[in-house]
């Protein structure tokens, strides 16, 4: 276990000025971060089921990449008992466990140096539809992770969660208007101003804007639940053939955008359709295990935003969520076709989904540089 309490004074320049850019997820990684789940008003049984699932995810990642886990001091003993021994536990306060959204975006330069972008965070909407209050500890997470690695920090003047962007490492950024243009994130900024800031801090040149994310996604449609890059020039899209499903018009509109766009290199996109599980719903028993608090209520019968797109690429391994016995094998086979050189590892992940996200949402990769 390590303890981090280091002030990382932000740089006064921007990554693009300094020759830094966000690499693609398939670039080599030196570590993956996770955070301990404990909120009783979001996780049933005060997180016990989720903690066991997080341990399985950490184990699946750890076979390919070192895993760090931020844990509040009060839960260190519990985490040590539950987590695999190879996981490095780091004492760290947080309001919840979404490392993708509260952690830093690590950028690299051509010499292999790493720095981190620390985005603004308001718990997916602040006082206008946000998912809990307060979020002050979450705002400190990125800085603490960067301090653990000794990386210099850029402080970006933009409310942004890591799950709301995907990049191909070659100048293209994919995102959703439902989230990034939502009035509860950066209402004072225009679309053009948001793009300018992403150019500054990710060093990207071309944007692919999908309108909406997955139906009932409480993050306001994060792109990482809806679509992602598989490699340069190739994307994966969450899909259903059921025209009566509320997801269908969302996926159909996204497909039309992807079919009629090019990336930063001018390439037409090859599109892989990944079938949705379910539909899946929260059960009465699952709902009863969540206590009342400032978190969003978990209501029995509510549709869950399940998606196989919410996987992590980490050092030639794909760690993806097992969500539905009827479609899990189909998803695994499709992922193996898309990633023939990767090992495809499924982890039962319904407990993460019940909390509002999945494997990509609870992880944040640290690129290796060179």
Swiss-Prot record:
<dbReference type="InterPro" id="IPR017754">
    <property type="entry name" value="Agmatine_deiminase"/>
</dbReference>
<feature type="active site" description="Amidino-cysteine intermediate">
    <location>
        <position position="361"/>
    </location>
</feature>
<dbReference type="Pfam" id="PF04371">
    <property type="entry name" value="PAD_porph"/>
</dbReference>
<dbReference type="GO" id="GO:0009446">
    <property type="term" value="P:putrescine biosynthetic process"/>
</dbReference>
<comment type="similarity">
    <text>Belongs to the agmatine deiminase family.</text>
</comment>
<protein>
    <recommendedName>
        <fullName>Putative agmatine deiminase</fullName>
        <ecNumber>3.5.3.12</ecNumber>
    </recommendedName>
</protein>
<dbReference type="GO" id="GO:0004668">
    <property type="term" value="F:protein-arginine deiminase activity"/>
</dbReference>
<keyword id="KW-0378">Hydrolase</keyword>
<dbReference type="GO" id="GO:0047632">
    <property type="term" value="F:agmatine deiminase activity"/>
</dbReference>
<dbReference type="InterPro" id="IPR007466">
    <property type="entry name" value="Peptidyl-Arg-deiminase_porph"/>
</dbReference>
